[in-house]
Structures are given as structure tokens and as C-alpha cells.
Amino acid sequence: MQPNRPIRQALLSVSDKTGIVEFAQALVQRGVKLLSTGGTAKLLADHGLAVTEVSDYTGFPEMMDGRVKTLHPKVHGGILGRRGTDDEVMSQQGIEGIDMVVVNLYPFAATVAKPNCSLEEAVENIDIGGPTMVRSAAKNHQDVAIVVNNSDFNAILAEMDQHQNSLTLETRFDLAIKAFEHTAQYDAMIANYFGQLVKPYFVAEEEDAEAKCGQFPRTLNLNFIRKQTMRYGENGHQKAAFYVEQDVKEASVSTAKQLQGKALSYNNIADTDAALECVKSFDEPACVIVKHANPCGVALGADILAAYNRAYQTDPTSAFGGIIAFNRELDAKTAQTIIDRQFVEVIIAPTVAEEAKALLKAKKNVRVLECGEWSGTQQRLDVKRVNGGLLVQEADLGMVDLADLKVVSKRQPTEQELKDLLFCWKVAKFVKSNAIVYAKDNQTIGIGAGQMSRVYSAKIAGIKAQDEGLDVAGCVMASDAFFPFRDGIDAAAKVGIQCVIHPGGSMRDQEVIDAADEHNMVMVLTGMRHFRH
């Protein structure tokens, strides 16, 4: 076990300068000498701090427009030198020990995220000296502290005060892990960016570069941070943890703030994600109740209490122990209605009123989450693990509106039927395939999910409605994919379905349309499928 290592000299070179002046001032107060480069050195000097520029220390100026600053033996020897082993050679070469390296890297991700970022601009924002120093310091964590997160400044100073300006090996090891995570993420971003460009950059302009490459890199590097570990996974014998992306801007289960309740389980997170993503697709006050990642009740209302009452009415049996999501603030009256009526695992809403928080405290096991408001959805990739590989695709963010609908039946829909069709279609997108949804007046009446046969999904939707005493007559029906045969339309007509919305695209589309006309039903095609597996 290495002893605590005192910090006598620190090298500071940062792109994100948040808090760096205050941290440097605190180091100087503790007797630490400062080395620095370029803009960081100027900032520290402007604040009256005694700082030695790396170029003065090495005897070599910064050159090539800043491309070469710290790539020098006197820098890396000072970082990599093993105390007690390399002391003699360091002394012979005039190399001073560097006990702390404070570095964060050029903002590559922010640069390439700009709409008009050129390859040349991206290249100039690839940090070379920074990652090299970070890796050197992390490798020699036995003797050197590497700091890549500005949020660690205060904790480092506190520990130095506890240990006579030293940091423990445990802390240096933890900082080294963060450093390797930091450089791994940085290199992954660069590899992904170049992997997307390789063909478009080298093919002739007239060739279809997008078709040859598209947005998928040659190698896929994913970087997620562990947010929590769990007692178990989907089942009791499976270990599990939850990892999240950095810099997610939209409201999501990964960024939501938990106000109360036990830690979220694996299944809680999966179901809450399904509920939240569904409710986010509606503009009017809406409620979505989810069980086993499938909506079991969805409704709109004049307010969220009305929406909840109608969503619950679809399937009270399945709603027991479910997840409830809202797209408006959770108020006290709605919260009280929920806890009086049913057992619920998770409630998630953009915000929760103070009165509602006070009421929910009486049910301490109910997990309550605030996800914040949302204004849009970020484009992202969906990843699914298969044995030996990953399936990667664009997230299904496709939606349709009135202008996209194609009426193919003889009977034309009324204005209310069109509203119900669009509502029903939005819900079907979030139901496991094969998905059939019955709806009326912006309320789900029956949901059939996850069946191998589309006809059986329709039958289950009807059975669910019948069991809850809901009238299917006059409902609209949505199907996440086309009807391969007319039998689904015939079955729907028997229970009183008046309108059907589906993507179309079957070889037997005309046969299916003819069936709708025979039953005097409205049939609308979207041209967009929503398989969900």
C-alpha cells in the first residue's frame, strides 16, 4: 500500500474553466506550485496567481497553432516518474515531479453537434496533449492525482485538509478510474464521428454517400454511466444495474427526480419509460397506465383527474400495481383519488404540486417522480441485444397527422372519428405487437397486445372491453401493422367497430378495403408501421 502522496506541484490545463480559478487559489493557499498552459495560464495570471507556463518550464514554446504544448519529456517525465524509483534520472534530466494533473479536454462533442461543423473544424478540436497527460497521470496514480471532473474540486480540497495536503491511494485510484472513463468516452466520440464520415468523405459528390454510410459508424462505441445498482433484475435470480447517457436534454426516466418511495426496480424503470414516452405524445391533458410495458389504459380529459378516471376505467384489474404517467402537473385531488382507489408502483409527471407531495407522503412506498416539462424529442438510437451482437436503429419517432391520412373506404370519417382515429393510432404505437386498440371519445376501450395473430389481439381487445362493461359499438380500431387478410375486419365489424386505421401495404389491401366497404366502415391508411417487439 502506497502512503498518502502530498501535492506540491500541479499542472492545470482545462477547456471547461468552471471553478478553476477558485480551485487554483485554494491550491496556492495550501502551498502548491502551479504549472499551466495557454488560456488557462492567462486566466490564472489575470487573477493574480503565480503560475509558471509550461513553455517556460520546458524551454520549448507552444507551436503549430497550439497543437504542441505539453508533449515534452519534462512534462511527461514529471507525471510518469515513479517516486523512489526514478528520482535519480529525474534529477539528472532536470525533471520536476508533477503531483496533480487537472485536465479536461477540447469540447469535441459540442463542436461536431453544430449543424455546419466541417471536418477541418472537428479535427482541430481533437485533443492530443490533454488525453496524453490524463492517461499518463492515471497510469501513475500510485504517485499522481488526475482530476478530470470540475465537480471533484471541493472534495479534493477537503481531503487535502484532512491529510496534510495529501490524497490517499484510494482517492487517487478512484480519480484514475474517472480519468480512463473520460478518455475512453472521448475517443469513442471521435471514432463514432469518423466512422460515420469515412465513405461520404472519400466518395465522389455525385455518388449516393448517404446510402453507402448513413448515420451508423463502422464501429459502435457506447458510453453510459452507472446510476444505480438493483437488488435484482427482471427476475429475482438476475443481477442488474441502470446506466444512463450523459447530456440527455429531454424529459425521461433517466433524468427524472425521485421525490419519494423505494428505489426503482428494473421492471419499474422499464415500465415507467413506456408510460412516460406514451404520454409525451399527447398535447391535451392525458393519463397513461402501464403494466408489463404495455398500456392498459389511456385517455384524454379536460384535466388530468378526468383523464385518469377514464384511463383507469379501461382495465381496472390490470391497473392494480401499475405505473401511472401524466403530461401535466400532478395535483392534490388527482393524487388523493389514486391512493384512495388503487395500489400503484410509480407515478410520474412533469411536476408535482406541494399539496400532492404532502398527501403522497402517507403512502411512503409509492415511488413519485418528477421528469420536468418537455418541448420536443431528441433523435436517438435504439439498441437491442441479441446473442453475439446488437441491433441498432433510429428510435421510432414517426408520427402522423390529419394531412398524412389516406381515406380508402367509400364512407368518409366524421371530424370526431378522425380525432379518435389519431388518438387510437398514437396509443397503438406503444403497444407490443401484434397490437390492436379500440377507442372512443379519446379513451381506450380495449387493448389487445403481444399476440402472434392479429385476429387474436382484436379478440382480446373485445374481451377486455366486455369484462369491464364497456361498449365497443361505435369504437374506432387501430392496428400497428397492416391486416394480411380480411378476417380482422370481419371480426371488428361483428363487435360494432365503425372505423379502422392501419398502415396498409399488404398484398391483399384491396380485399381488406372491400371488407370495410361491405360493413360500411371507414378505413384510413397511415403509410407508417409501428411494430414494437
Curated annotation (Swiss-Prot):
One of its GO terms (biological process) is 'de novo' IMP biosynthetic process. It catalyses: (6R)-10-formyltetrahydrofolate + 5-amino-1-(5-phospho-beta-D-ribosyl)imidazole-4-carboxamide = 5-formamido-1-(5-phospho-D-ribosyl)imidazole-4-carboxamide + (6S)-5,6,7,8-tetrahydrofolate; IMP + H2O = 5-formamido-1-(5-phospho-D-ribosyl)imidazole-4-carboxamide. Its EC number is 2.1.2.3, 3.5.4.10. GO terms for molecular function: IMP cyclohydrolase activity; phosphoribosylaminoimidazolecarboxamide formyltransferase activity. One of its GO terms (cellular component) is cytosol. It holds the Pfam family MGS. InterPro entries: AICAR_Tfase_dup_dom_sf, Cytidine_deaminase-like, MGS-like_dom, MGS-like_dom_sf, PurH-like. Gene3D superfamilies: 3.40.140.20, Methylglyoxal synthase-like domain (3.40.50.1380). Keywords: Hydrolase, Multifunctional enzyme, Purine biosynthesis, Transferase. Pathway: Purine metabolism; IMP biosynthesis via de novo pathway; 5-formamido-1-(5-phospho-D-ribosyl)imidazole-4-carboxamide from 5-amino-1-(5-phospho-D-ribosyl)imidazole-4-carboxamide (10-formyl THF route): step 1/1; Purine metabolism; IMP biosynthesis via de novo pathway; IMP from 5-formamido-1-(5-phospho-D-ribosyl)imidazole-4-carboxamide: step 1/1. SUPFAM superfamilies: Cytidine deaminase-like, Methylglyoxal synthase-like. PROSITE patterns: MGS. It comes from the Bacteria. Residues 1-148 form the MGS-like domain. The IMP cyclohydrolase activity resides in the N-terminal region. Belongs to the PurH family. This is Bifunctional purine biosynthesis protein PurH. It comes from Pasteurella multocida (strain Pm70).
